[in-house]
């Protein structure tokens, strides 16, 4: 009994996030859903995230077996102090975070509680940003496109990490913002679309063994686009007019 006690005590805090799958299977499945070529060519991923991805790619190339804990150890924690110029490289008023450097204090706390999950959330943010731009173009604040992006990010994060982790990260993204106001319609819109994305993905019919790492994100994106078109999400800017109440979304291609 004593040996068992010490074995349990040595398990990292983030281990409880993982499913009941075997250590190796869970890690292999996790990596199989990362399309390294796609993310290496991303225009908005931070250099820190690219470096983490390269570490993972090198490690899995030279190691036959590895666990989620091994992958966690390959990801650099989010630093509490960063170069201010680097932190303002991207406009995060219209994009989701894709670098550890630009995360707020609450997001960094969640990221560091499970770095490999945190890295995945940033990767999913990059994918959601690109999908929104491809479908809706620019200037999407508070519109169909904005709603789509937040819901897609949360759906992807739930699928590839866990619902609880994605909920904590997305909530920290809102509540840790310097201009956070729980009563603002902007905050209410984001939190609601975040929650809807996490809920919708649980009922999606997704393949258990996709041929590559882009199949499931593509299917989830299409499902969220359909939900956007069918009014499952909310916005408060309609045809260029800003309203004081939330309105249902109505298109998967226009704002």
Model-predicted segments: where are they?
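Intrinsically disordered/low-complexity terminal segments and short unstructured peptides
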Residues: 21, 174, 225-227
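Sec-dependent signal peptide cleavage junction
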Residues: 5-21
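Intrinsic disorder/low-complexity signal
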Residues: 15-16, 22, 51, 90, ...
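Glycine-rich short-loop/terminal segments
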Residues: 23-155, 159-166, 249-255
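Sec-dependent N-terminal signal peptides
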Residues: 1-3
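Active-site or metal-binding loop neighborhoods of secreted/extracellular toxin and effector enzymes
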Residues: 191-255
């Amino acid at each position: 009994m004593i040996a068992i006690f010490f074995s349990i005590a040595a398990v990292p805090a983030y281990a409880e996030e993982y499913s009941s799958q075997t250590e190796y299977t869970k890690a292999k499945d996790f990596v199989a859903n990362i399309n390294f070529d796609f993310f290496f060519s991303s225009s908005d991923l931070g250099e820190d995230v690219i470096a983490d991805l390269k570490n993972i790619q090198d490690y899995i190339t030279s190691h036959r077996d590895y666990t989620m804990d091994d992958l966690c150890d390959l990801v650099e924690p989010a630093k509490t102090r960063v170069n201010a110029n680097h932190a303002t490289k991207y406009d995060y008023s219209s994009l989701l975070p894709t670098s550890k450097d630009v995360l707020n204090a609450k997001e960094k706390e969640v990221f560091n509680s499970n770095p490999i999950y945190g890295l995945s959330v940033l990767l999913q943010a990059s994918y959601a940003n690109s999908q929104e731009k491809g479908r809706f173009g620019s200037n999407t604040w508070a519109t169909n496109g904005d709603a789509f992006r937040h819901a897609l990010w949360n759906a992807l994060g739930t699928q590839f990490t866990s619902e609880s982790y994605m909920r904590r990260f997305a909530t920290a993204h809102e509540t840790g913002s310097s201009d956070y106001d729980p009563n603002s319609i902007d905050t209410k819109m984001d939190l609601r679309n975040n929650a809807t994305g996490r809920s919708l993905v649980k009922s999606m019919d997704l393949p258990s063994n996709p041929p590559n790492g882009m199949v499931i994100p593509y299917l989830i994106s299409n499902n969220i686009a359909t939900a956007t078109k069918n009014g499952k999400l909310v916005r408060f800017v309609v045809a260029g007019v800003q309203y004081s109440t939330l309105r249902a979304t109505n298109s998967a291609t226009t704002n």
